Amino acid sequence: MKLHAALKNPLIVHARDAEAAALDILKSEDAGEVGFVMHCFCGTLETARGVVNAGGHVSFTGNLTFKKNAELRAIAAALPLERLMIETDAPYMAPVPYRGKRCEPWHSMEVARAIALAKHLEFDEVLAQTCCNTVKFFGLPEAVLSSAPQ
């Protein structure tokens, strides 16, 4: 984490089943100053809000689309869209309707659709904002947005 801060690079955190403990460490290290994202978030609403309040992003994968994960969709609905990211965990965790098949990066569109449904927003709005969030998070040139999916 010290290297992350020194290089001013955003931190990607994989903290499966340890989201709250990881958040405590991230807060103690002021990780929000440079930026961090909780990859493949599966924690609680309280932890997700803590991530946002600490300056981090919450990222969802194909598991958001699974029937059993209504609570995870409620968490996505409760968070500000400006703090959400979408991703896959390819080649694993393919979203519905591709569940059981090899996950591909383009399946992240299904994650965006699930967020749009959960938040009662248009798919295009979710896709545009999560693309902007990603560009800003990684410090990419804004020209990247002109090639973003429409």
Question: Each PLM stretch: what is its role?
Answer:
Residues E82-A90:
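Non-cysteine beta-strand/loop elements that form the S-adenosyl-L-methionine
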Residues R73-A74, R113:
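Active-site phosphate/pyrophosphate- and oxyanion-stabilizing loops and adjacent acidic/basic residues
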Residues L3, P105-Q150:
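Mid-to-C-terminal alpha-helical segments outside catalytic/metal-binding sites
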Residues V34-M38, H57-G62, S146-S147:
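Short hydrophobic/aromatic-enriched beta-strand-loop microsegments
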Residues M93-P95:
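Amphipathic alpha-helical segments at domain termini/boundaries
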